[in-house]
């Protein structure tokens, strides 16, 4: 693992019974990046994160985080990692101030300035008890407690799940603020694809336990194209087409979504004798949704993150 790679896995696999939850995962997360890790429910995202943090042993394969073997993470490595989940588990009887004072005792690099900054950003009162906080306020307090130790690597497991739009925006804005430090890395899973467009540099797509794409966000957006075909009558049957992610028929046309659309595919489409072929880009959200469709194939996009310089 190079100094520029913060997380790396090689063939990382975890079985629960006969079924793999994560299968042969090869992943590399560059230092200083904001890395989005997405997939449908049950795709293996949380299982992967738990393995990375040494909370769940892999069935086979290996990985490193901050240069340390994930099977044997020492305390000095854990002290450099901030971890936030959707549960936001806190002591209900404590106040926001109590939570900060309690946790600060365990972290020599604790920054009261960061803690207060995030708490203020979410409009939390220091004397408010955890049990009386809304879900969004609990998320804000959890984020403040995670960031105040000034972690080198921040791992977020869908922390905005279930938040209202205002609380979600506050959480995303806090992430944007964090990216100002070039040496900090953020690895986050999310169900909200709009979050990725706002903050992420890289995206990895996990589906049916396997990695399907891993590359810079801009490269992903550039690789996926929408193609509309118009015909004088009902559209003919499609031939086998490489890289086809989605196909939708209308009365006199088709809407197709491809990864790595090229001249060879266009020649194949021209054999259908359409009146018109119109090629256009998709939003990142639509491209990701298309990529997760049942028709898609695996590993169309070669990861540019696998071999960071």
Predicted feature locations:
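A structure-centric signal for secondary-structure junctions around beta-strands
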Residues: 3-4, 78, 224, 253
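Alpha-helix C-terminal capping segments
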Residues: 104, 119, 236-241, 266-273
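C-terminal coupling/interaction segments
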Residues: 258-309
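ABC transporter nucleotide-binding domains
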Residues: 4-9, 14-207, 212-213
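A structural detector for beta-sheet-dominated domains
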Residues: 10, 30, 230-232, 259, ...
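ABC transporter nucleotide-binding domain
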Residues: 171-264
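A broad structural signal for short, well-ordered beta-strand segments within beta-sheet-rich domains
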Residues: 24, 224, 244-245, 274-278
